[in-house]
From Swiss-Prot:
SUPFAM superfamilies: D-ribose-5-phosphate isomerase (RpiA), lid domain (SSF75445), NagB/RpiA/CoA transferase-like (SSF100950). The active site is at E106. Disulfide bonds: none annotated. CDD domains: RPI_A. The lineage of its organism: Archaea, Methanobacteriati, Methanobacteriota, Methanomada group, Methanococci. This is Ribose-5-phosphate isomerase A. It comes from Methanocaldococcus jannaschii (strain ATCC 43067 / DSM 2661 / JAL-1 / JCM 10045 / NBRC 100440) (Methanococcus jannaschii). One of its GO terms (molecular function) is ribose-5-phosphate isomerase activity. GO terms for biological process: D-ribose metabolic process; pentose-phosphate shunt, non-oxidative branch. It catalyses: aldehydo-D-ribose 5-phosphate = D-ribulose 5-phosphate. PANTHER family: RIBOSE-5-PHOSPHATE ISOMERASE.
Length: 226
């Protein structure tokens, strides 16, 4: 069974949590994209009244494609946010997100939801946060040099994320740059705050406020809770 099959299993299970009348946070990434598709199918088939709040331009375009009505945080609170992750620490359910460069908008929606549910396949589970992925840090462009210096002084190895199909740095939906920092994570809660306290940092990709993780495995979907 491929990772894509496991992601689809999780997406189908997650859609069952959606009830008529809910406002849903629509995450970004491959698993979140499958969830958006399955949610659109369920809304159409069951004639549900469900609204979505997208966490990125990509999520917005997918929601429009699958005819999910969209609203904003200015108008509504979020009942449940569904989002993916680059890696999940099994014992704490702390996450690293932001491989797609959308972690600022994701965190705004996810942290302000009544419930934050993470959707992953089993390959995303790690024993220690930071095992596979760097911490993405969104930075105001004029501050990139001083932010890199501050992260280096904290013991990190910081590099500007460059575009795959363009010259120069990746630019986020907010018009900012991404710095990827490789560093030891002993206290994720404290490090999340510490990085955000650096002047010029918009937001980082450590997520510590998670309610539930749905994990796609070859034996089925398992639920992890704190």
């Amino acid at each position: 069974m491929s990772n894509e099959d496991l992601k689809l299993k999780v997406a189908k299970e997650a859609v069952k949590l959606v009830k008529d009348g809910m406002v849903i946070g629509l995450g970004t990434g491959s698993t979140a994209a499958l969830f958006i598709r399955e949610l659109g199918n369920r809304i159409r088939e069951e004639e549900l009244t469900v609204f979505g709040i997208p966490t990125s331009f990509e999520a917005k375009m997918l929601a429009m494609q699958y005819e999910i009505p969209l609203v904003t945080l200015d108008e509504y609170d979020v009942d449940i946010a569904f989002d993916g992750a680059d890696e999940v620490e099994e014992t704490t359910l702390f996450l690293i997100k932001g491989g797609g460069g959308c972690h600022t908008q994701e965190k705004i929606v996810d942290y302000n939801a009544n419930e934050f549910v993470v959707l992953v396949d089993e390959s995303k589970l790690v024993k220690k946060l930071g095992e596979k992925f760097p911490i993405p840090v969104e930075v105001i462009p004029s501050a990139y040099r001083v932010v890199i210096r501050a992260l280096s002084e904290m013991g990190g190895e910081a590099v500007i994320r460059l575009g795959d199909r363009k010259r120069g740095p990746v630019i986020t939906d907010n018009g900012n740059m991404i710095i990827d920092v490789f560093m030891n994570i002993d206290d994720a809660i404290e490090l999340e705050k510490e990085i955000n306290n650096i002047p010029g940092v918009v937001e980082n990709g450590i997520f510590t406020k998670v309610d539930k993780v749905l994990v796609g495995t070859k034996k089925g979907v398992k639920t992890l809770k704190k």
